[in-house]
């Protein structure tokens, strides 16, 4: 291993950190930070968050006996230093690669990852579950949840904190405040106060005072309790957490190893109520290019360690995300009722561009998808035209609101479902696999999928005109095909697909961007003597029933293709054909969709090939339906 990390080279597991001095822990943190930077420069990934918690990670593994003591990282963006210290350093340069380490915590990967993560605000609830199980079994290990201040925008975190004191007396929550959105540290006095209020002497005096107070009449007793908590809250900023039943410590400098170790040891000794330790950290800490970047190099591709310069790909076609944003801006220029809503992802959804054009019509509600959906519903109910741009995977978090607050009331909220289908390096936690099924199940919903960037623009225009019911359109991560874009897109006719290529034997019906692979599959079929019709469905709801019945009459087989799970577009088509008797005449059908597994991270093309949704996979599906062996391209095949 590298001589640049002599101390880290001796660390095989967290147990090896427990005999280190404070000076050695500081050295170890510096080496872990260097290793994290070097590894992510090779793989790309989430850099800034991990750099901000290096000292905290080292201190946690030094003070607590992991994996016996449970440490749960919220989201998991910050877990790279944790992985380096927990026996995965030899694989750290496989982060987010096919067959490599996950970019998040993952139970199947290590005993030091007791709970998987990737979506925000789950850590405290999971930690409470571990506490309840521990208490029921009569065990005494510590349970720690590390959650960022951004995740506190999600209601689930407060639901868990509200239930904490009713669940257990032994829980540690560490608030990693890297935006100083709650309270900044106040120099040495802040660290001194944090250490003071977490120490045994202070708590003993406090306990004695409470004993005396209990002898007072009820009104005076309540007044004394409030006075003590608010007095402490004024100097520590923790009154809110105290009201939720936590003993608040902080804010402390999350890069001060001495303070971290001291306070964590004190917190470990608590046993009479949950503890919240407020650590203020700096995202991107210790790497100048990250500290100087507006986003603190939150997510990066491969980069030069010396300069921080990222190895951006040569300019290609605009991304689907950008196409969505640009068309939404065009529609908003002619309709002042159009507004846009994002849940803490303005850049990821392209709404940062919309926000520059229409700041007063752009709403970032934070990590709060449930609120985002019902907020949009309220705006729609009062005559506005809201577009809620939310990653498919995150829309899952607001599904009850989609059903109850939008669909049942028939409100015209427009859902722009970005990152639909497989997303590559972020793996199964971020894949947009299920939205076709869960959105298509809702009465009255108009559900579209773009085959290319021109189609996406037309779907934005279509959604803008739908005023009597909810609508949704899905589109993938990545670049479009480089097609010429119209000055302003024309809306589509609701529920009507299009024939892209006419054939006679097999009909391939694509929903989404698998259309290009479907056309390639048609070429492969032609080489085998089979003529294929290729259709872009455009709509999963309402289906183009006239088109589907025509295809059923005129072809021997129908193959549906979609970038989603089972129970989606193919299932809708199959049910519609069955209900109209189209299967009674021996029509052959195959529904090609994502496999019934959670696919691990890899390059998207490789993942779709594994799923059988590339041209070769579609070819195999068609040949299977026709009862033919998959022979060489030059052969005509034979009947099975």
Swiss-Prot record:
Cofactor requirements of the protein: Mg(2+); thiamine diphosphate
Keyword hit for Metal-binding: yes
EC number: 2.2.1.7
Residues that bind thiamine diphosphate: 77, 118-120, 150-151, 178, 287, 369
SMART domains to which the protein is assigned, alphabetical: Transket_pyr
GO BP, one annotated term: terpenoid biosynthetic process
Molecular function GO labels: 1-deoxy-D-xylulose-5-phosphate synthase activity; magnesium ion binding; thiamine pyrophosphate binding
Domain of life where this protein originates: Bacteria
Pathway named in the protein's UniProt entry: Metabolic intermediate biosynthesis; 1-deoxy-D-xylulose 5-phosphate biosynthesis; 1-deoxy-D-xylulose 5-phosphate from D-glyceraldehyde 3-phosphate and pyruvate: step 1/1
Any single Pfam family the record assigns to this protein: DXP_synthase_N
Sequence similarity: Belongs to the transketolase family. DXPS subfamily.
NCBIfam families membership: dxs, PRK05444.2-2
Name of the protein in question: 1-deoxy-D-xylulose-5-phosphate synthase
Taxonomic lineage of the native organism: Bacteria, Pseudomonadati, Pseudomonadota, Alphaproteobacteria, Caulobacterales
Gene name in the database record: dxs
